[in-house]
Amino acid sequence: MQGQQKQNAGGGGGDNASPCIVLDGPIIVGAGPSGLAVAATLRQHGAPFTVVERSGGVADLWTNRTYDRLRLHLPKVFCELPHVAFPPDFPTYPTKHDFLRYLHSYAARFAIAPLLRRTVTRAWYDHPASLWRVTTTTTSSSATSVITEYASPWLVVASGENAEVVVPKVKGRERFAGEALHSSEYRSGERFRGMRVLVVGCGNSGMEMCLDLCEHGAMPFMSVRSGVHVLPREMFGASTFGIAMKLLRWLPIKMVDRFLLLVARMVLGDTEKYGLKRPKLGPLEIKNITGKSPVLDVGAWSLIKSGNIKIVPEVESFSGNGARFVDGNEMAFDAVIFATGYRSNVPSWLQEDGELFTEEGKLRSSGSSSEWRWRGPNGLYCVGFSGRGLLGAGADALRAAADIAGRWQETQQAAANISSV
């Protein structure tokens, strides 16, 4: 934390006994890849910043809520943060451990030292003072909560789209006697060896967990509620994502989608034959509209075709020893894994007029201006909410940090002019 002044009252409307720390630079909420990218770019511009993080270290999602076999689903060239490339000895698709080493090295390189175990409980704009007021609660080793208020002209929301787990409300879920967990708690299929496991969800995580379960001697069943696009991770020896990005420079998105689906059918065959219906919209069009990514196959598809991974319909209800599906069939299971994703927690703490975020914590549509993809009113910025992954987060971080640094430099120049009078 740089360039701060400590005050007593603060005028923030919170606990009068809590300190208020007035910051010269922005306050960044979140020390994941997005927050680190903003901080690093501000460092490059010579501007101060303060990062607050609710967990005990950087990249909490990657450290504590991912499975062991996870790799980046896109080639490393599309996942680099600003200013630093991946080491040349890293594989094309880095493991989660590779990526964590990269992130920790990145933080050290730019001397980013987040204030850890600070959970933001409220952030609001103080119009009379022209400052963002951010209240955090810190739990120390003695389990005593410490409330602190920070004040800054700029607030960067970098807490991400994956802050809270999503578990669907399914009738009878509490009655299921077997183990039930969210995918954030899954590490390896070893503990499920010999068990019948229902995986609810057919995204990239659900598919890869089914693959992992198979490889560890479990019997996975994947519950599919809606259509899903499965694409080979590579086409013609190159990354499917990379090919799509190149084609989009010259062709409309619908035409690129047709090409991807044609090649996917040639490589994978007819996915609907095995219970995976394709949506009416193409994979890139869906990604553009909803942010939902297609599945990039890393081996699960061949096990679906061979019957080692079985596709089942949407779950209607749970019983003590299994599940009933919407087609009326019932099956017994030893465990259930909800690979049902995450959501933003921004609405629980950010108080704004809805100009930047929806009530669900998603980034509001930018309309005709791309500016609103990363900047809101009164010095409010967001990074990592555009649904474009690490590549998009890096681009947003560059723009947000450059904008903040320019405004900070203006305030410094104005202060220097006043002091020289």
Curated annotation (Swiss-Prot):
The cross-references to InterPro entries, in alphabetical order and at most eight, read: Auxin_biosynth/cation_transpt (IPR050982), FAD/NAD-bd_sf (IPR036188), Flavin_mOase-like (IPR020946)
MF-aspect GO terms: flavin adenine dinucleotide binding; indole-3-pyruvate monooxygenase activity; monooxygenase activity; N,N-dimethylaniline monooxygenase activity; NADP binding
Positions in coiled-coil regions = none
**Binding locations of FAD:** 30-35
| Any single Pfam family the record assigns to this protein | FMO-like
| Localization of this protein | Endoplasmic reticulum
* Expression by tissue: Expressed in leaves, young panicles and young kernels. Highly expressed in embryos. Expressed in roots, shoots and panicles. Expressed in root tips, leaves, stems, young stem nodes and developing grains.
| Positions of NADP(+) binding | 201-206
Catalytic activity reported: indole-3-pyruvate + NADPH + O2 + H(+) = (indol-3-yl)acetate + CO2 + NADP(+) + H2O
Question: Is NADP set as a keyword in this record?
Answer: yes
List the PANTHER family hit by this protein, alphabetically: FLAVIN-BINDING MONOOXYGENASE-LIKE PROTEIN (AFU_ORTHOLOGUE AFUA_4G09220), INDOLE-3-PYRUVATE MONOOXYGENASE YUCCA8
Q: Which family does it belong to?
A: Belongs to the FMO family.
Q: What else is known?
A: Calli overexpressing YUCCA8 exhibit high levels of auxin, low regeneration frequency, overgrowing roots and abnormal root morphology.
**What protein name is recorded for this chain?**
Indole-3-pyruvate monooxygenase YUCCA8
The organism of origin for this protein: Oryza sativa subsp. japonica
Originating gene: YUCCA8
